[in-house]
Amino acid sequence: MRIVMKTELSLYVDGNKIICEQHGDIKNAKKIVLFCHGFPGSSRLVRLCDNLKNSSISLVEINYRGDKKSEGKFSFLGSIKDIKTVANYLKVKYKVPLHALGYSMGGLYVSNIINKEPHIFKKVILLNPVVDSMALFSNKPLMDELWKHAKNILSLKTPEM
């Protein structure tokens, strides 16, 4: 039985130390997957490391500014910059194909990045990505719409009534 190695990688972005967790033998990897999780706290929702035990793929999980051991304050634009910085570092240092796995909000970050820099990743996987960012970031709270529907359901009224 092969044990998946786990080490930490740290980089500085805008003076803040960003901590990434490396899973697998990154020095001998034939591919690297950069795992971009969603909001801070959602990084443990997807467990991929055990699936890498017998592969030549290394997984690097980024912890954005303000998440876990990473310094700084969390922000959406900061998270995008963190991903781009880590991606460029991995491409230059290891010179193997770099893929992205964007989960939830991380999927929105990765989508934003590849829209402007389509060649930064060889392949991209979006797992349950946030796709309606206009509704998410609009001035009108999403909760108003949800409460409207909830009241109709709770009062057993159809929307036409």
Region spans (language model):
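N-terminal cap/lid segment of alpha/beta-hydrolase-fold proteins
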Residues: 1-25
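The alpha/beta-hydrolase serine catalytic core
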Residues: 18, 120-161
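Short beta-strand element of the alpha/beta-hydrolase
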Residues: 30-38
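The serine-hydrolase catalytic nucleophile loop
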Residues: 38-51
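Catalytic nucleophile-loop/oxyanion-hole region of alpha/beta-hydrolase
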Residues: 40, 67-94
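Conserved alpha/beta-hydrolase
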Residues: 53-69
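Short beta-strand immediately N-terminal to the catalytic nucleophile in serine-hydrolase-like folds
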Residues: 100-102, 127
